């Protein structure tokens, strides 16, 4: 087992300029996640949880700080390498209803990241979607359902 942490965040900051001044959404966050560990980020609405996740995945640029994934500085890699790294990273949002596209079916939502990666054929994607649904305990009958037609537990499993 490697001594390199899975994720290491050092003095991470994300500020937004607003008409009323600077909003410090993420301010000096530090943590390490080792292989096999899980981190839950909790807090009140609007405290920066989602922003923190988006900055770690480099969906938003940080204002300052460093983010390492398996020893690689996410803030300094090129687009191709970042896409590769993101295949092993995920945010599970607290509210599965708000994080799922209401215009897409369950199978379309699950297939979307596989399509974006452009590594699998249509048939392979369909097979992978079936396997994923089985793995998280989603019955085949919900594959053509929309998020609003499912309970919170099923929506959460789609996000995962």
Where are the predicted features?
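Conserved ABC ATPase signature
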Residues: 146-150, 154
């Amino acid at each position: 087992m490697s001594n390199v942490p899975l994720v290491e965040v050092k003095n991470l900051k994300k500020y937004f300029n607003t008409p009323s001044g600077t909003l410090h959404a993420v301010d000096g966050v530090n943590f390490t996640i080792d292989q096999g560990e899980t981190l839950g980020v909790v807090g009140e609405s609007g405290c920066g949880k989602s922003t923190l996740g988006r900055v770690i995945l480099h969906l938003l640029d940080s204002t300052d700080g460093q983010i390492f994934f398996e020893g690689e500085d996410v803030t300094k890699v090129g687009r191709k390498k970042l896409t590769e790294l993101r295949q092993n990273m995920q945010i599970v949002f607290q509210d599965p209803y708000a994080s799922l596209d209401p215009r897409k079916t369950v199978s379309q939502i699950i297939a979307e990241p596989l399509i974006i990666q452009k590594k699998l054929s249509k048939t392979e994607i369909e097979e992978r979607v079936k396997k994923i649904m089985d793995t998280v305990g989603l019955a085949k009958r919900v594959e053509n359902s929309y998020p609003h037609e499912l309970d919170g537990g099923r929506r959460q499993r789609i996000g995962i």
